[in-house]
Amino acid sequence: LHKHCKGDYSAIAKEAGLSQEEVDAYLNYAAQFLGNLGNYKSFGDSKFIPRIEPRQLKALATVSKETLGLYEKFKDAVYAGEDLGKLHLGYPSAGHVSTYYPDSPTITKEEIAGVSDFLESKGLLPENTRISKTDGGFKVLVASASSDPSPEDRDLKDNEWTLEDGKKVQLVFGDYSKEMDTIAHHIEEAKKYAANDNEREMMEEYSKSFRTGSLEAFKRSQKAWVLDKGPQVESDIGFIETYRDPHGIRGEWEGFVAMVNKERTQAFGKLVSTAPQYIPLLPWDASFEKDKFLSPDFTSLEVLTFAGSGIPAGINIPNYDDIRQNFGFKNVSLGNILSAKAPNEQIPFIKDSDLATYQKYRDPAFEVQVGLHELLGHGCGKLLQETSPGQYNFDFAQKPISPLSGQEIKTWYKPGQTWGSVFGSLAASYEECRAECVAMALSCEFPILELFGFGDGSANMDNEAGDVLYTAYLQMARAGIAALEFWDPKSRKWGQAHMQARFSILRTFLNAGVEFCQLEWEKDDLSDLTIRLERKRILDLGRPAVDEYLQKLHIYKATADFERAKRMYDEITDVEPFYENYVRKAVLKKKTPRKVFVQANTVEKEGKVELREYEASNGGMIQSYVEREYV
């Protein structure tokens, strides 16, 4: 459509017989579609539809034969339809949509768990797989350029097994083979420009992984990536985050290229170097902490390109615990994502008396929060494991004492178990919550605020450091209210891991008592809902409440105590009638559109690279995609 009208949408309005308002509604949809790389929100996993009628969309499509053909092909997938379950990503057996389980509407949650657990027992990692149900069993589709990699190149020599119930499990290579082949080719070309041996090894292992489907090769690429310290241009690619798989273990493809912001990185560097003195301030003893804090790379980046369904504000990867515990990890704060603002952005739920402080300090408060979340949040803690039969990474004769019970621990990770396999679909949100709570606890340390340029390191709620701390707590409380947008009353499930976590932290603030935090309103419909948070009580009421919650989150994770963790987390993230019937409705009325990011393109001309930027508008978003090459 864009090519047909050459970007002149007022002309296409006349051609299609539509008003400019109707065309603008289509453009809003198109920009959101491109920003989320699909018609389900990347942050919320619910379907969004155009605000124009199907007949109006068809009128737009009739302007050319090509657009009409595409419309006829996809028209049934664009709008809501009668099947409400299809409005959400989730398990197919619950009536939801998931492309991780293609052509398998009858595959059950138990079958997915059974196949996944079986493959885990064989040592096959799941991130680059999908599962398809067949008459006699299951096909496990492995993303790879080759449809028949040699047994030596595969992670498992065998590729077919029979389960106890007689059903067959077969590995089928070559999923997304065209895309994986193109990606591997470009990775091999990029290797020619590697700056050092770590980058060369990284490219070689990427290529092996994308050609053969080997995630062991991908893990080697991530080890090399971690060891490549402080590059000027930072990049990583692969099946990394598992938020969108309803089972919580299969990855979504993403890749990014970004440049280092040296000034901001310096502040994060100070945080890295002083991290070992702050970890002991968290509410557990050394038994539940890594033997040695592996000092990670902590970099503030300006994103050039982030290819994926959504762009985070910070990243802490790789997610493989053995690499994290033995080689470390990288923390990345994405500065130009943190500070990006849409024109005339509204800030609901903040009192007028707090607004000036909030607007002035929300960016620095968020930067401190992201730094602590990524570095110390995801970076701290130890999983207590039986690493191989009879071998433990803790003193088994005198087991650690749980601060929750005052007794020796009774659970730990068994051989072959990982954090992800034990906690499953709970893992993503639970770990985000743990990291957020670490950040909320340690943002109360005034020497940390001084590292970022606020205050003199002494505890003082009345100076600029106090402003940043107060804003950080307000920001989290506000995020907890806004989170209700991402909870679905029909399925009674949370559509977004971070938002479920933030709601639980708001509940933790409120549980600390009205002396600390309270939701206030005068109107019956809560249209004037605001947060009252007592600045002077953060240190003596707010932080202890966070510490108590964080201690449970951490100890349950460290000891593989899934049952207690799930019971606690389900309870605190349960949306009670007051929140469902009143607060959520107020949130939806004040809902602000989710940001989509218009990204620049790079074009090579005669050996030189030209940067093309676009305006922050729907048209700019579409134009940027029109001028981009695709796999």
Regions found by a protein language model. Name each.
Residues 20, 26-148, 158, 166-362, ...:
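Contiguous, non-catalytic segments that form substrate-binding/exosite surfaces or channel walls
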Residues 372, 376-377:
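Short active-site segment of divalent metal-dependent hydrolases/proteases
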